[in-house]
Swiss-Prot record:
Any one of the GO CC terms: prospore membrane
GO terms classed as biological process: ascospore wall assembly; macroautophagy; peroxisome organization
Pfam (any one): Pex24p
Alphabetical UniProt keywords: Meiosis
Name under which the protein is recorded: Meiotically up-regulated gene 65 protein
InterPro entries on file: Peroxin/Ferlin, TECPR1-like_DysF, Tectonin_beta-propeller
Lineage: Eukaryota, Fungi, Dikarya, Ascomycota, Taphrinomycotina
Amino acid sequence: MTESERTSHLDILYENQRGIMLCGVPYFSEKSLLNFDPAPWVDQHFVASPVSTKTATCPDPSWEWAWQRWYIDMSGDVDESGWQYGFSFTMNNWHGKPVSLHSFVRRRRWIRKRKKKELRRDELPLVPESFTISSSYPIQRSSTQTRSSFEDDSSDFDLSEVTTIPALLRALQDSRIDREKLEALATFLASASIDEKVYVKNCKKDLLKNFVFEHSCRKANELLNASLTAAEASTSQVALRESPTPQD
């Protein structure tokens, strides 16, 4: 287990529903699940979970939530609400577009990051300022090295990997300064689909809470608005070009 895995963890819950498509409209509910279906909520190993996103808590007091709430994983082949559809839960053939007579069940993935609580100074274990291997050679603790471990401003993520919504959320949480958060947001928006941009904009209020300074929040808001406006304009132009030309 890496140091990152010991100090942070991404909790995963799957939400399951059964239903049917009528005239292109999905009618699904967890109350429609059959006896042989999985539970309404299952964990990352698809084992029935006694909790949902509304009731889940950290496993013990040494953990706390790094993210303020649960997020729908919008990566992969999903619809605008994060659902994947299939013929049955036992078949591993999930798709983001519901198809009549082939979409009787659906699921979506929820994620939330938690982290180990940081000990306050008065909770740190007592360690002597020096210790001795032999009576002749005292070994002094390096205060410079200790400070550097707390003052390191480098982040643990690679900007090139910020191409999905979960990766963006992780980057915003892990970044220590607003400049890095803005770079992560700009990188994501450069490759995001219009649906992803709409989703992020709808979560804008929670997203902006990750920024420390007001001017950074304004800059992030400008990036979101400009990116979505450009994407919508591009989509409109494509639609106009593809529309049939009236014949004389």
